[in-house]
Every structure is written in structure tokens, then in C-alpha cells.
Amino acid sequence: MSTTQPIKSIKQLEQFKKYYQEVSPDSRNYALIILGLNTALRISDILRLHIADVWDFRQKCFNRHIEITERKTGKNTSIYINQEVRQALSACHLTSLDPDDALFPSHKYKGSPLSRYQAYRIIKKAAIYAGLPEHISCHSLRKTFGYHAWKQSVPPAMLMDIYNHSSYQITKRYLGIDQDDKDQVFEKIRL
């Protein structure tokens, strides 16, 4: 059985992000990828988002956080909306839409959110363009966030909290740490 992997290579990650921005421009698909990479939300939670979850129509600005009850765990979480996400969502012209509209609407079924399968196809198309291995899926966005946070020295306890994991073992498995990652630590530490 294959396991979904994070996107570890920065070069491939940049190619992956570039696909819907430059190669096959689509602001919705680009925003989906950027939001997934930068929030560590599960795709099931991303697809349930509405415009009002990210945009304050009274203040005419982005909300500071996405406040959500995770579908899988039932836990409440607050996710900061960083500049990358704000820029990607800005191209979607949210202010001209209804607050209750799906943030990532289906083009095929008007009024409905994007399906999980369609989100998978969007991600897979960008992954193929970037030359990524076959084990890339919707969950890779969430895992990629954790992997790169870990590489930037975010403490494992913080990642456990972000992911709402009950044990470090789950988080460790999630990050996809392999022998190459361990080798880099030994190469980097020179006492």
C-alpha cells in the first residue's frame, strides 16, 4: 500500500505552485493549493469553507483567522491567514460574491463546492507538471506544511498541536522523515 507523501523538494514545490499561476492559469485552483499548503487543513475542511470564513464584508478585508470545527476530530481550531494565502485569494475577487458562497466552487455544479475528487485531480495535474512522485494527493498539502515547518525548526510539540495529533509518533509518521533527512542532520552538525 502506498502512503501519501509531502512535497519535500523546494524546487518541485515551486513548480507545483506555479502550474495554476503561470502554466494553466486558474485563480481558484491556485488559491486551493496555496491555502492547503499554508494552513495544514484537511481537504474535507478546506472544501467546506465559505467566503465569509476568510473575508469580512463589513470591514472589507481578510479575516485574521479561519475559525473552523474540524470535520474529522470535531475540535475547534483557529488558523492564521498568512500573506501567501491572502494574495492567492485576492485573485478570486471574493468581494463581488455572496458571503455564503463556497470558497472553492464547482464549475460544473453551480452553487456547490468543489468535490474531493475534483480537488484531487487539480492537485494531481500540478504534481505531474512538477515531476512529483505518484504518491501525491490532497493530503500531501497538509503533510507538506508540516514537513517544511519541521525543516525550519518548528518544535514537534507545536506541529502536534497544529495537527491536533494525540501523539508524537503520529506527527513523526506524518512528516515523512526518511533516511535522507536523517543524513542531512548528520551532515549539518559538525562539532
Name each region found by the language model.
Residues 1-191:
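Conserved catalytic core of the tyrosine transesterase superfamily
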